[in-house]
């Protein structure tokens, strides 16, 4: 209960912010529990130093810290709802955390552990003897009609395994300060990675405030969770293979999946990466099939197995449920736990707790009459604290010594079965509001009475380790995404360079006849045709001449044309997000900067701004791939990305060279100058040949000079060198991609250079060049498909022939 209080009772250092907050509480509903102020209007334990630090920053400092936190959030890629590949929504992280003192936390912690034990026992009965149904202690009709009751999960857990390994619980505080449960999250409990990210960002943005705070750390909990996953393995217990199963980049939680997998040092995989054979789950890698021991799943029950559950699911693994039954793989959590999330169970839990555990339920569920407590959130615009309603997601993990119900820890100490993360994910909104629907999140600080030990992400090895460097454990899907990341990155760069040159000629339009002809050729190279009547109606104006060409060029920044910048960037982002855990932090920051550039550019700013945007885009793409080159291990994943880059680059160069032969306006040497500038060879050419343009010299530089990284010869050599180091079969014969590369190299090396040297004089030389370019383009176009067939997994997924669900 918060009562009126004299400002003099408040600590002077926090007087301004707290006095204003207290005034706002007085205008609200009286008798409301507040997270920061007690019934006498005094700051609760843990808030004093925090508010003092915030007050001491002053308005300017608080505004700067708020902006710094939001910048770090965006920089680290904390983006949600990214169904549009180039857009997304970021949360706003409140610089004022939610402080929970130790007595409050202990009450919540005890209730959370009890709830995990209760739901675990309830699962065992629902999918086991079903005595609760027989005794009338469950709403039989409602549960049997629920789509979350998975009948094939009956007695599916072998070896006395615990069904609930990780448990998310959404709670609020009511007007009396009592913790109440809004929902249980068991199928794909998300938020741990986000809670950890929020904590790390708070420590970076507010180092003094964080360092001086007596709070419990999160790293120990995640280390415990990782050790629990290891302990779950049936086989290979000394070094089990752990994976995190994600729905993929289309999931709004994909950022967290990648972040958590990276933090726990486990592979991030999708359903298509896995296959079940003889009740064993295997991971498809470049080096062959690798056995999987433990799956930390972030897919809902129904989507995990298209053979026995939802037949239309593309997210799961056919046969996964049978593998779980047979003990071929351990799952966190067991399939079927979705029934425990049913809201209809809420009224039965007090009785079930007495029946199954012999205990009184410590955490009651909220109901429609529950009124929420208030808590402060910092408004950076108004520079004050605003009372609001907070939701909190807590996380509970089973301990490593209690992965089976018959273990010593589980038998001797009920409290030892589970541990709670000392913190969580808090968000602003009405009780029960989904976290992704909120716009403001808070870090949660649980006060500690003693200094907390440091927990390293690296652990002391228990025995000898076999060094590995080749990267054969890379999932083939990841290799494919890296390959296409390289291709789309280079394709985007080539188009940006062509646009840059076209926009430069546009700015010189009607001032130089040659420049006008060059602009037409560049529009041809960009595959930009004259706008039709429908386009003119959309633009609400008939366009001719300069306006027509300017509009056509600036339209390349829209998403109308699939080969325009935005769609190409969308493909780049889709592949980058699918390999997020394989990219370094610095590389990902450049990706964020690219995303910002693409999202904020306004074509109405005109040709000059568009040209600068193209230059910046090329520079940032070079920075991204440069960082990948410097920071990624040069094993198979990097090699596939490199092959993709140089394959697309060489095809782009060959297409540009064909343009010089087919140019209807024949602007002559000026077009060769554009080719040199577009391929970034202008400086190298001038250093060798001064200012004189010779087509034969240009061809030598662009086609045959293997010391020039932008020449066809160099790029073919580089692709060949990378392909020589890829995993291959034991066959003595060359595979399809090797034969295609030999074909392209042979065409280049057997070219009649003397004949090509008369390019400017004879049509025969032009015919010879065209034949050479065609002889290069044909096998290189086929090379991409050959690589895909040899190295990337394209497996037809099994489907149900007969429906086997509850709604059958």
Regions found by a protein language model. Give the residues of each.
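N-terminal acidic, proline/glycine-rich, low-complexity intrinsically disordered segments
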Residues: 1-10
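Conserved N-proximal alpha/beta basic substrate-recognition cap immediately N-terminal to
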Residues: 24-27, 35-36, 199-200, 248-365
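Alpha-helical transmembrane segments and their helix-helix packing motifs
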Residues: 78-163, 174-176, 186-242, 248-257, ...
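ATP-grasp fold ATP-binding core
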Residues: 158, 170, 294-301, 349, ...
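Two-metal-ion RNase H-like nuclease active-site motif
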Residues: 167-173
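Short hydrophobic beta-strand that contains or immediately precedes a catalytic carboxylate
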Residues: 181-185
């Amino acid at each position: 209960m918060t009562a009126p209080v004299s400002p003099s009772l408040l600590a002077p250092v926090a007087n301004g912010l707290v006095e204003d907050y207290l005034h706002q509480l007085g205008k609200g509903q009286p008798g409301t529990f507040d997270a920061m102020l007690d019934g006498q209007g005094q700051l609760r334990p843990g808030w004093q130093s925090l508010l003092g630090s915030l007050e001491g920053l002053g308005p300017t400092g608080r505004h700067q810290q708020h902006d710094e936190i939001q910048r770090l959030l965006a920089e680290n890629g904390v983006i949600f709802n990214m169904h549009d590949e180039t857009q997304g929504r970021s949360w706003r992280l409140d610089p004022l955390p939610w402080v929970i003192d130790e007595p409050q936390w202990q009450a919540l912690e005890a209730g959370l552990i009890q709830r995990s034990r209760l739901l675990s026992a309830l699962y065992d009965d629902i999918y086991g003897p079903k005595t609760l149904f027989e005794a009338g202690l469950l709403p039989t009709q409602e549960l049997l009609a629920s789509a979350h009751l998975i009948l094939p999960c009956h007695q599916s857990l072998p070896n006395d395994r615990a069904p609930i390994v990780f448990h998310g619980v959404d709670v609020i505080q009511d007007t009396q300060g009592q913790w109440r449960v809004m929902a249980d999250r068991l199928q794909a409990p998300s938020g741990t990675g986000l809670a950890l990210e929020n904590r790390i960002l708070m420590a970076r943005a507010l180092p003094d405030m964080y360092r001086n705070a007596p709070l419990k750390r999160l790293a120990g909990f995640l280390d415990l969770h990782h050790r629990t996953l290891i302990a779950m393995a049936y086989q290979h217990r000394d070094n089990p293979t752990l994976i995190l199963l994600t729905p993929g980049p289309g999931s709004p939680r994909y950022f967290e999946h990648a972040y958590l997998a990276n933090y726990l040092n486990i592979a991030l995989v999708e359903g298509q990466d896995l296959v079940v054979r003889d009740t064993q789950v295997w991971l498809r890698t470049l080096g062959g099939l690798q056995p999987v021991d433990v799956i930390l799943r972030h897919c809902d029950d129904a989507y995990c197995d298209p053979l026995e559950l939802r037949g239309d699911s593309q997210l799961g693994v056919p046969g996964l449920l049978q593998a779980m039954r047979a003990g071929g793989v351990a799952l966190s959590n067991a399939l079927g736990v979705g029934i425990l999330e049913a809201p209809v169970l809420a009224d039965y839990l007090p009785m079930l707790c007495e029946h199954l555990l012999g205990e009184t339920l410590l955490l009651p569920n909220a109901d429609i009459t529950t009124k929420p407590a208030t808590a402060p959130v910092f408004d950076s615009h108004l520079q004050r604290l605003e009372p609001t309603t907070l939701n909190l997601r807590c996380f509970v993990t089973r301990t490593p010594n209690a992965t089976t119900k018959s273990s010593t820890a589980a038998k001797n100490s009920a409290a030892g079965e589970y541990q709670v993360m000392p913190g969580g994910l808090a968000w602003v909104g009405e009780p029960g509001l989904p976290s992704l629907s909120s716009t403001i999140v808070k870090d949660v600080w649980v006060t500690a009475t003693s200094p907390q030990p440091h927990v390293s992400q690296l652990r002391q090895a228990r025995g000898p380790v076999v060094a590995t460097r080749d990267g054969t454990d890379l999932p083939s899907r990841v290799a494919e995404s890296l390959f296409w990341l390289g291709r789309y990155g280079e394709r985007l760069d080539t188009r940006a360079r062509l646009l840059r040159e076209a926009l430069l000629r546009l700015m010189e339009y009607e001032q130089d006849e040659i420049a006008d002809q060059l602009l037409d050729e560049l529009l041809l190279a960009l595959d930009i045709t004259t706008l039709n009547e429908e386009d003119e109606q959309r633009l609400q104006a008939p366009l001719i001449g300069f306006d027509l060409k300017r509009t056509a060029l600036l339209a390349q920044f829209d998403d109308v044309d699939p080969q325009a910048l935005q769609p190409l960037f969308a493909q780049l982002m889709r592949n980058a997000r699918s390999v997020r855990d394989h990219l370094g932090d610095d590389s990902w920051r450049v990706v964020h900067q690219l995303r910002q550039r693409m999202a904020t550019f306004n074509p109405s700013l005109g040709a000059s701004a568009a040209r600068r945007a193209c230059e910046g885009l090329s520079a940032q793409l070079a920075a991204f791939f440069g960082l990948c080159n410097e920071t990624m291990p040069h094993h198979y994943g990097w090699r596939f990305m490199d092959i993709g880059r140089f394959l697309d680059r060489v095809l782009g160069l060959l297409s540009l060279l064909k343009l010089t032969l087919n140019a209807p306006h024949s602007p002559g040497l000026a077009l060769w100058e554009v080719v040199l500038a577009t391929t970034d060879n202008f400086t190298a050419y001038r250093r060798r040949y001064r200012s004189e343009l010779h087509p034969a010299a240009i061809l030598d530089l662009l086609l045959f000079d293997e010391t020039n990284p932008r020449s066809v010869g160099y790029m073919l050599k580089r692709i060949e060198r990378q392909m020589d180091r890829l995993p291959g079969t034991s066959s003595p014969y060359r595979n399809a991609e090797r034969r295609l590369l030999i074909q392209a190299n042979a065409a280049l090396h057997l070219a009649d250079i003397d004949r090509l040297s008369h390019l400017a004089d004879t049509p025969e030389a032009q015919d010879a060049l065209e034949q050479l370019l065609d002889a290069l383009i044909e096998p290189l176009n086929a090379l991409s498909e050959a690589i895909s067939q040899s190295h990337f997994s394209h497996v037809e997924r099994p489907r149900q022939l007969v429906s086997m669900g509850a709604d059958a």
